[in-house]
Each structure stands twice: as C-alpha cells, then as structure tokens.
C-alpha cells in the first residue's frame, strides 16, 4: 500500500482492479472498492462487509462474494494483513491501550475494531489538528481567510472571491505540512501527502 502511494496510484482504482480482475474500471467498480477499502481497513468480516457495502454505498454482494473480496483485498495489501494480525495478537493478550502515530493514547480499548481504527483515524485527526495550528500561526500570511467549519477531514474557509487562489495555496500548504509531520516522523517511511482543495460558493457546491 505504501508503494502504491509512493508511485502515485489511486488506491480505489487499484483495489477495484484487484477485486474485478479488470484493468478498465467504471463508476460502480470504484464504489465497490471504496466499500471494501473503508470496511476492511477496520477489521470487518465478510458479513460486516456485506451489510456495510449495501448501507453505505448501495453495493449489493452475496456473502460468498464478500468473502472473496476480503481475501483478494488482503492479497493485494499483505502489509496491512500483517499489521491486522499483529494487532489481533496484542488484543488477544488483553492489551487495552493503543496509540496514534504521534503517541496519543487511547485507553480501555475492548474491541478489536477499535484497536484497528484508532491508529488510522486518530492519526488523521492529529494531522488535521496540526494543520489547524499551522493555519493559526500563519494567519498573518492570509488575513482575509476565515475558517468557519471543520468536519471529519475537511476544513471550510471563507474569503472574498478575488482572494480565493491565495487562500487555496495557504490552506493546502498547512494541510500537507501538518499531515507530513505526523506520517513521516522517522526515516523509515516516506509517505507522500496529497490534499484536495476546491473553490466554490458554498460547502455544498464543493462536493
């Protein structure tokens, strides 16, 4: 998976190709891949994937298909499988503490899915908070920018239309640098960080 990121591959496309066995991928294939990527990342079994795919993406699959997709997913990303197996062993030994990449602790973790979720989503949250801190520190560079909303991994900033390009660059730098500090804390890995910044008249239009 790290190799795919480093080479600039789109993970949803890569997963879809693995699941379907086809090079040419359509819109429905990407929906399937998103369900599999986001579902299995946090430890779902075949039944959980079947329910999640239908509820969250409108993707129908049989239990047999869900099991097949699960097997192909971990064949495609063996490093993730090794990490899951390691976390499962730690969980089975009764370890109830887990941490994000920055070292932020979460205690009393009873479910395996929570143990898998926290290092991923928690690390993303740490990166976002660092990005917000950078925006504050650099507010003099872009005084016309007014942050108005943070939702999951999104930051909504208001400004005049003529300042939009400048604000876009300012926001993008902060987001990339904030996450880069979190992901690339050692020389062992070099994870490229990419963000998408859209200019629109409303949050609804940006989607």
Q: What are these regions, as identified by a protein language model?
A:
Residues 1-207:
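Conserved catalytic core of nucleotide polymerization and phosphodiester-bond processing enzymes
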